[in-house]
């Protein structure tokens, strides 16, 4: 593959490393060996080459941008933690989301309730979304898939080598792909407002409850500290003689002071 003209931003490299998107599995399939950079000796985990991942991101974004109508691209994820990222990706790129259970015959049976006739298929995991990948091959769909080192890449046209077993890494991959698509279409900067990646990440309800409780504890602690500081300031003011309220000063004393000053 020719060297890409779009350099990968440092923020994207940090995002892939933090989300552990560069960490594959212990095993490697034959067709995924070309994307392996090395092996961690302690855990025996394969490390994916980020440069090759970036090349495939650009290739996938170019395929998406070649569509006349973005809704002709269908994004599928049967995993629970991949649904939010898919919905946010489709909101950003105007693609068609398919989340939850994939109904057999969606692509090749017109008798189903909501048949689809897309031109491009994007899946978060070719193993979990195997039914969609197989049906896409029957109707000659161009398939883009986020693949781990031990995935079978049969019927996949563009492989994006990335960790697809982590909720954060899948969300990071969809975020990067959406940014590339918007950059190619509108020229929007790639690394602008990187905090938007939080909108792609799935949060478990139990985890959200813990975060809310922690936030309440922090707020209560801040309120307690603020009240203590206010109390200490009042005590200091009273000791220094600053705690006299204006209402306690008589008007006669003020007028007498002003008369003496005039004289």
Curated annotation (Swiss-Prot):
Record keywords, A-Z: Cytoplasm, Ribonucleoprotein, Ribosomal protein
Record bears the keyword Ribosomal protein: yes
Organism of provenance: Vairimorpha ceranae (strain BRL01) (Microsporidian parasite)
Protein task: Required for the assembly and/or stability of the 40S ribosomal subunit. Required for the processing of the 20S rRNA-precursor to mature 18S rRNA in a late step of the maturation of 40S ribosomal subunits.
SUPFAM superfamilies to which the protein is assigned, alphabetical: Ribosomal protein S2
Gene: RPS0
Domain of life: Eukaryota
Gene3D superfamilies listed in its UniProt record: Glucose-6-phosphate isomerase like protein, domain 1
Name of this protein: Small ribosomal subunit protein uS2
Location of this chain's protein in the cell: Cytoplasm
GO MF, one example: structural constituent of ribosome
Cysteine pairs bridged by disulfides in the record: none
Family: Belongs to the universal ribosomal protein uS2 family.
GO CC terms, sorted: cytosolic small ribosomal subunit
GO biological process, one term: translation
Main subcellular localisation: cytoplasm
Assembly behavior: Component of the small ribosomal subunit. Mature ribosomes consist of a small (40S) and a large (60S) subunit. The 40S subunit contains about 33 different proteins and 1 molecule of RNA (18S). The 60S subunit contains about 49 different proteins and 3 molecules of RNA (25S, 5.8S and 5S). Interacts with RPS21.
InterPro entries for this protein: Ribosomal_uS2 (IPR001865), Ribosomal_uS2_euk (IPR027498), Ribosomal_uS2_euk/arc (IPR005707), Ribosomal_uS2_flav_dom_sf (IPR023591)
CDD domains in UniProt: RPS2 (cd01425)
């Amino acid at each position: 593959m020719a060297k890409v003209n779009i350099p990968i931003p440092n923020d994207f490299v940090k995002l892939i490393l933090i989300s552990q998107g560069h960490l594959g599995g212990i095993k490697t399939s034959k067709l995924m060996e070309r994307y392996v950079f090395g092996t961690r000796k302690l855990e025996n985990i394969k490390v994916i080459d980020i440069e090759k991942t970036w090349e495939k991101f650009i290739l996938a974004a170019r395929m998406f941008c070649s569509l006349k109508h973005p809704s002709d691209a269908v994004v599928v994820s049967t995993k629970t933690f991949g649904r939010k990222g898919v919905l946010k990706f489709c909101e950003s790129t105007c693609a068609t989301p398919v989340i939850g259970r994939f109904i057999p015959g969606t692509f090749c049976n017109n008798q189903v309730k909501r048949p689809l006739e897309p031109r491009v298929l994007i899946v978060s995991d070719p193993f979990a979304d195997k039914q969609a990948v197989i049906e896409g091959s029957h109707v000659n769909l161009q398939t883009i898939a986020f693949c781990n080192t031990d995935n079978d890449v049969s019927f996949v046209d563009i492989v994006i080598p990335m960790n697809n077993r982590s909720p954060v890494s899948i969300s990071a991959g969809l975020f990067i792909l959406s940014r590339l698509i918007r950059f190619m279409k509108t020229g929007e900067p790639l690394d602008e407002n990187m905090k938007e990646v939080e909108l792609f990440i799935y949060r478990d309800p139990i985890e959200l409850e813990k975060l809310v409780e922690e936030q309440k504890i922090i707020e209560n602690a801040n309120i307690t500290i603020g009240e203590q500081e206010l109390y200490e300031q009042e005590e200091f003011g009273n000791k220094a003689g600053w705690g006299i309220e204006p209402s306690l000063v008589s008007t006669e004393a003020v007028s007498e002071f002003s008369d003496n000053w005039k004289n």
